[in-house]
Amino acid sequence: MTVMKEKGRKVIATNRRARHNYTILDTYEAGIVLVGTEVKSLREGKASLVDAFATVDNGEVWLRGLHIPEFSHGTWTNHSPRRVRKLLLHKREIERLVGKSREGNQTLVPLSMYFSDGKVKVELALARGKQDYDKRQDLARRTAEREVTRELGRRVKGMR
């Protein structure tokens, strides 16, 4: 995966399945505690958010399931690829997340990971899981929108 520039920040990884499997209710920007070889591996653009999720334990937010492969030029000091990593949020934000996630069927899902001013940030979303019929409705809606824009494009071309 290559590093892309988006809105003045270098995007390392995105969780494209998250928007398909979840309804995004709210987003937060969080810092992440990393070791040196993890940052070097991220600078190479290597990370996977596919199975990642966040939990709140004892007033701290932890990111689980994030895969950052070992640094290619690392030695015995390399990190464990799937270790649990701490997310850095303000206390008020954590309390708000705990309150909202306890309301029912809501989870914390990372949407993207990026560099901002040399620091790695995680875009974290409070989300609710979609049912299969919700996914089918979204797919039908997107297909209809695509057909409408295609037809409008054809009509505009025909007028020239």
Swiss-Prot record:
It is found in: Cytoplasm. Its main location: cytoplasm. One of its GO terms (biological process) is trans-translation. The keyword Cytoplasm applies. It comes from the Bacteria. Transmembrane segments: none annotated. Gene3D superfamilies: 2.40.280.10. GO terms for molecular function: RNA binding. Keywords: Cytoplasm, RNA-binding. PROSITE patterns: SSRP (PS01317). SUPFAM superfamilies: Small protein B (SmpB) (SSF74982). One of its GO terms (cellular component) is cytosol. Required for rescue of stalled ribosomes mediated by trans-translation. Binds to transfer-messenger RNA (tmRNA), required for stable association of tmRNA with ribosomes. tmRNA and SmpB together mimic tRNA shape, replacing the anticodon stem-loop with SmpB. tmRNA is encoded by the ssrA gene; the 2 termini fold to resemble tRNA(Ala) and it encodes a 'tag peptide', a short internal open reading frame. During trans-translation Ala-aminoacylated tmRNA acts like a tRNA, entering the A-site of stalled ribosomes, displacing the stalled mRNA. Belongs to the SmpB family. PANTHER family: SSRA-BINDING PROTEIN (PTHR30308:SF2), TMRNA-BINDING COMPONENT OF TRANS-TRANSLATION TAGGING COMPLEX (PTHR30308). This is SsrA-binding protein.
